[in-house]
Amino acid sequence: MRDQKITRRRLLASGGAAATAALAGCAGGFENFGGSGAGDEGSSESQQATASGIDESDGAATVGMVYALGGLDDRSFNDAANRGIQRARLDDGVEYTNHEPTSVAGFGQIQAELASSANPSYDLICCIGFLQAEGLSETASEYTDQQFMIVDSVVEADNVASYVFREHEGSFQAGNLAGLLTTRDVDLGAGATNPEETTVGFIGGLDQPLIHKFEAGFRAGVEYANADVDVLTEYLGNFDDVQGARDIAARMYNDGADIVYHAAGGAGVGIFQAAQAHGRYAIGVDSDQSRSNPRYADVVLASMVKRVNVAVYDAATATVADNLPAGEVVSLGLDSDGVGIVYGTSLEPAIPDDVREALSTSREQVAAGDIVVPTERSNTGGA
């Protein structure tokens, strides 16, 4: 890195769109998510996607997308971010390039490459995932005239807009659902519950504080539904080992779990495979995974959706309007529809009316602050 701070002339488009609405208003309830929308990327860490046809003379703004480990076509977290920038392109004419680092060390390198680029010159660089925070802290301080946004972490800098989600709140809903259904006789699609076991599971990707929020919320939701339900927990160590996730899920199903919730990114496909093989159920994450992974819709009871797409869309369109909330933290939870539960497309009929009502009630209680969901495992009986 250079010793001196670097600034460069911003090329903000004139005649931009009007200021974007608040995220809560933009959300308007959970949407039906489509496919991954991912492009066919090269293997190089800094490979730029050309699908957006970068032409700064035509685009309202130019955005560089730096995705989390695992890259596009994960049918989960990264693909949700990709849908957001695609929508910004359709609605506001935003141009963008895609970048898929394959290591944590690659994040800062790509961030700096984009920030120093003159062709194209980026109006906004979107950093998807908490592992980008360390690199971005350094990059943002060096390129002080460059605007950034980050998802899932807070970087304290005047040129960074930080979007964070209260995943523990959405995971509480997932746990409440699992805790209620594991005690019932559910037999639909390719799975079934075993009410005599009353055991559920959680599989995380990296054993990190952010993923602990998923586990903590899930455990709290299960306990809220039924304190006698056992929760099995294991961490994969990454977000892309499909076979590893399948093996862990298989052990959990063999140990009596009939529903497994995951926060393991693209590796979650392995959990769905194990659910089909063992005739059990799963709960997806980040996107409606019964839609993004339709071949597993017969075992995906629901998904805990994070509106990463809306965060990216909001940041991109705010950049067009020259009102990016740089230097601020935008926190999204159940109260703003930033997170929530969507039932699976095939298995929605399996959800009893009283269970739906229970989840609707708990959602209102969490949103109102009547139920305070823990963010740490130590507060829920976890490790």
For each feature predicted by the language model, list its residue ranges.
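Terminal disorder- and signal-encoded targeting elements
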Residues: 1-146, 150-162, 169, 173, ...
